Design a protein with these regions (language model features):
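Intrinsically disordered, low-complexity linkers and terminal tails enriched in Pro/Gly
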Residues: 7-30, 200-203, 274-291
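Alpha-helix capping and helix-coil boundary motifs
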Residues: 14, 112-115, 165, 233, ...
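Generic structural signal of hydrophobic/aromatic residues within well-ordered alpha-helices
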Residues: 41, 48, 56, 69-70, ...
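Structured, mid-chain assembly/scaffold modules that mediate subunit interfaces
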Residues: 62-223
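Extended, charged amphipathic alpha-helical segments
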Residues: 217-293
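Generic, ordered loop/turn and secondary-structure boundary motif
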Residues: 8, 179-181, 249, 267
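Extended interaction regions within the primary functional domain
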Residues: 46-49, 53-54, 90, 115-121, ...
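N-terminal-proximal low-complexity accessory segments that begin disordered
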Residues: 1-86
Length: 293
């Protein structure tokens, strides 16, 4: 009979066990003000994503703790760069492929600022700051003079508008800048033509966004909820505490600076006495006075 006991339901634990399990749902005095909305992660990202992203970028630039955390995250994620190793058994072909790969890594950046391994570090930093990064595959022409006619262009999270949520004329849904077909597959990304915060890029009037097929885009992010379509800054859970800690540090430094100042009152017994009890002035007109606490 003991064998069948494992298929039976658990024995009731009594009122105390039920109370312990549902304590988080209580609305008594301690938890009366805790009423978070039950929203989908995508709705939260669409409404608060731009402000969260702006605050995250400011913290990483102005807060030393956040800046160090960003660099540590990138160093632990990619280090000096993830280097692939060929599994081709033909030694001659493997050497040719390896030389071609090494040549391409120096030309991989579409902006011409760094190499393939530097791009990995930039992606890692964007993952920490913005929670996501977009890599656009840019095929090149033969006259561009590249050994491999392909380059990678990094696009920040701001380049894909959070507010672009609409229905395309073809029936596809665009959510936070990402176009989905009728069965929920990603078919395109609607990128801005220029960064919304870059006042130095004053181009002629062009459409606000450009449609890029999904097969030409790598969307790198870590979803934390099922169905999540955009990334969240990795610093988001500690953002408020870091901001308040920064204010506390400034206030504490000001308090210490004020406390370290030496203050006193200057008194004299007669109007004709020297203000500080100094002696006679020297030939340069300067006099020396002593001051004690």
């Amino acid at each position: 009979m003991a064998f069948f006991n494992i298929f039976r339901g658990p024995k009731p634990g009594g009122p105390e066990a039920v109370r312990a399990r549902l304590e988080g749902a209580m609305a008594k005095r301690r938890l009366r003000g805790w009423n978070p909305p039950l929203e989908n992660i995508n709705a939260l990202v669409a409404s608060g994503g731009p402000r969260l992203l702006a605050r995250s970028r400011e913290l990483v630039v102005t807060n030393g703790y956040a800046a160090n955390a960003c660099e540590a995250f990138a160093a632990n994620l990619v280090g000096d760069g993830i280097k692939p190793s060929s599994l081709i058994t033909d030694a001659a072909l493997r050497d040719r492929v390896q030389k071609l790969w090494l040549a391409w890594t120096d030309e991989a950046d579409a902006d011409g600022l760094t190499d393939f391994y530097g791009l990995q570090a930039m992606v890692a930093r964007e993952m920490f700051v913005a929670g996501e990064c977009f890599v656009r595959l840019r095929p090149r022409r033969a006259e561009d003079g590249l050994l491999v006619p392909l380059q990678l262009q990094l696009l920040q999270s701001e380049m894909l508008p959070f507010e672009k949520t609409e229905t395309d004329p073809n029936g596809n849904r665009i959510r936070c800048g990402i176009e989905f077909d009728l069965i929920g597959r990603r078919v395109a990304y609607h990128f801005r033509r220029r960064h919304p915060g870059d006042s130095t890029d004053q181009r002629v009037a062009v459409p606000d966004t450009v449609r890029v097929p999904a097969e030409d885009v790598l969307h790198i992010y870590r979803p934390i909820d099922a169905g999540q379509i955009r990334g969240l800054p990795h610093i988001a859970p500690a953002m408020v505490r870091l901001f308040l800690l920064d204010q506390y540090d400034d206030a504490e430094l000001d308090r210490k600076k004020t406390a370290a100042m030496f203050a006193g009152f200057i008194t004299k017994t007669a109007p004709e006495d020297p203000m500080m009890g100094e002696g006679e002035a020297d030939s340069d007109g300067a006099a020396i006075a002593s001051l004690e606490p």
